[in-house]
Amino acid sequence: VVGYFLLLLFGAKRPLGLFFLEHFGVKLVMNWYSAIFASIVVAFPLMYRTARGAFESFDETLAWSAQTLGQSNTWIFWRVRMPCCRQGILAGTVLAFARALGEYGATSMIAGYTPGRTATIATTVYQLWRTNDELGAMRWVLVDIVISAVVLLAVNLLEKKQKAGG
């Protein structure tokens, strides 16, 4: 559904697609950056909702305390609010990354499948499976799992380092 909506908005014969093509020489569909854009559109709500929850649960007395000490709103945001909400932002980012890594539908609709140009791991797995290359598909699934594991390990190590004060 999201991929179809993106095609309706940014297709080569649609007003936005034509505008970008005529004014900037940029084709917004069937290329590698349309795959990235589709993944972001699909994954962003997960990141936003999780980060928003972190900001909504922020203890405002911390900000008020900093204000009484004469700190600016910018200082309070970066030195008080962001550190307190860091875990929620990080959790949302990891959720969005995981969702984007496995994104197939919108990506295949707006970017297509051109090996070496617009193929993502998810679209490659599908194409290999469709052509009965289960070993090839499994290799890419393992690559996907390894990437996910490395990202989660890095996030966990970063969190441990932050908690230890390093």
Provide a role label for each language-model segment:
Residues 61, 65-67, 137:
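Short hydrophobic faces within alpha-helices
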Residues 108-153, 158:
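Interhelical loop and adjacent transmembrane-helix boundary motif
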Residues 2-40, 111-115:
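Membrane-interfacial helix termini and adjacent extracytoplasmic/periplasmic loops
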Residues 7, 46, 50, 152-159:
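Structural signal for membrane-spanning alpha-helices in multi-pass inner-membrane proteins
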Residues 29-33, 37-40, 44, 62, ...:
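Alpha-helical membrane-protein architecture signal
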Residues 4-5, 11-12, 89-127:
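Non-cytoplasmic
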Residues 48-51, 55, 59, 73-106:
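Transmembrane alpha-helices
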Residues 158-166:
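Short cytosolic juxtamembrane segments of multi-pass membrane proteins
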